[in-house]
Amino acid sequence: MTINTEVFIRRNKLRRHFESEFRQINNEIREASKAAGVSSFHLKYSQHLLDRAIQREIDETYVFELFHKIKDHVLEVNEFLSMPPRPDIDEDFIDGVEYRPGRLEITDGNLWLGFTVCKPNEKFKDPSLQCRMAIINSRRLPGKASKAVIKTQ
């Protein structure tokens, strides 16, 4: 199997752009969280997100615009993160406990970003959310899958 060099080059350029943009986004989130008096969190992206952005020809500038709006929703994200995680397969559910949905989606009504919570890591103080998908669909509705949705302005 051969790798298309244009895709390889585009992916590496996009990865570098994501790295620099995410430093700025995470700084904005840290400052907004401090100003709101809530715990900060850290955003990451997956390689899968880069591949889908290239494959679906999603404009990264548009994606970054939505990522930058997350700083205005630190309270909602913190509320999501403060919920107890769903029990592992071998653990029992506790009656009456509302568990954190498996996925958080942030949307402007057209672009949908899907996040999952990363497993806690002792090296990092703040919890992390990893963006794994980006979909453009203005008619998309929240599905039956376990998720929470934050709508930006």
From Swiss-Prot:
One of its GO terms (molecular function) is nuclease activity. The keyword Nuclease applies. Activity is stimulated 10- to 100-fold by host ribosomal protein S1, which also helps confer substrate choice. InterPro entries: T4_endoribonuclease_RegB. Pfam families: REGB_T4. It comes from the Viruses. Keywords: Hydrolase, Nuclease. The keyword Oxidoreductase does not apply. Its EC number is 3.1.-.-. Essential to the early nucleolytic processing of a number of T4 messenger RNAs. Specifically cleaves after the GG dinucleotide GGAG within consensus 5'-GGAGRAYARAA-3' (R is a purine and Y is a pyrimidine) sequences found mainly in translation initiation sites. This is Endoribonuclease RegB.
